[in-house]
């Protein structure tokens, strides 16, 4: 595997964790990117190639829908927040409500908090625009505060050229180049 070529003389693989590795402030990983190890297939489980040295343990962590949790916090989206508190899988809940596969519901959940419209959704899910709009309408009926937060965040970034994150970090936007549509993703990811 390509990972073998990156091991040191002790057969250890090291990566670089970049604490502010993206413009939005999201953690990133490089050389190699161990945040993007391929998912298991029927043929091969890529993660099985990673083995801890004797006396050590490998740890794998998942943020468990952290972006959706932050979006609920910022938007005061109580309906979804209650589902999270009750241990529900929000992607499965959305899938059931819209009568679609979980993978499509996940795209809608994340798409909505980043401002996806019917045009982009229809392309992502390979469905007609009318159906995409129906999904979005139903979704916004279920979780109306996300639409409110998206509008408020974009207007604030457009007016002031900056947003402040819960960490105190400030993200500046070039208003002249209309980058304020990225304000929501920076708010959630930063």
Predicted regions span which residues?
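Conserved catalytic core of nucleotide polymerization and phosphodiester-bond processing enzymes
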Residues: 1-190
């Amino acid at each position: 595997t390509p990972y073998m070529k990156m091991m040191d003389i002790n057969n250890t693989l090291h990566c670089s964790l970049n604490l502010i590795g993206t413009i939005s402030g999201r953690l990133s990983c490089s050389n190699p990117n161990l945040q993007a190890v391929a998912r298991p297939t029927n043929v091969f489980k890529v993660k099985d190639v990673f083995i801890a040295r004797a006396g050590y343990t490998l740890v794998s962590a998942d943020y468990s829908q952290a972006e959706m949790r932050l979006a609920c916090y910022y938007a005061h989206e109580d309906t979804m927040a209650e589902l999270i508190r009750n241990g529900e899988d929000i992607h499965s809940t959305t899938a059931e409500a819209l009568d679609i596969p979980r993978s499509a519901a996940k795209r809608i959940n994340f798409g909505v908090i980043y401002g996806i419209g019917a045009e982009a959704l229809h392309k992502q899910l390979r469905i007609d625009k009318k159906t995409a709009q129906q999904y979005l309408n139903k979704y916004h009926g279920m979780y109306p505060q996300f639409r409110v937060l998206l509008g408020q965040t974009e207007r604030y970034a457009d007016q002031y050229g900056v947003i402040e994150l819960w960490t105190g970090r400030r993200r500046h936007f070039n208003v002249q180049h209309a980058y304020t549509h990225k304000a929501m993703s920076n708010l959630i990811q930063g």
